[in-house]
């Protein structure tokens, strides 16, 4: 649950045997899992972000003003995570259930809104009004204001993604081009467009 959405059967057996060995004590089991699994180098991209992890990471990166708890709760419910009201004692299914086509579309819409400094609307009328508003709140993204386009792309992808490939790199270089000037008037907006593209990528949905 902490590291894998779908752990391999040998891991389940390995830790299950240890759990029995320590007389079903939770603490030593968790210590063993965290000690052994977190030290591995290949655990990146093994879990899909749940809605809470997703929205908190976005608001943290953009340094938004503290969102209203009701707004966050509304977004989570839209995503199928009615906070403090799981469907059963097991909790939410998690895993691939956090990345249906509808949920992915909702996430991308929220990414667009937050990257342009707009709040998450909670009603049809509010959605229509939000689309026509200028920035509803200030946002601030940390990036190297002296870097080249490739250096800034690397900075953000290293921070936000567990891995990249040539195709994604090329797509990002089309957004933040080789002649990018970090001191130009529109530099921050250009980097925000890059950030928006990264957080809308399938790779960003993974931990």
Give the location of each predicted region.
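Flexible, low-complexity segments enriched for small/polar residues
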Residues: 1-22, 27-207
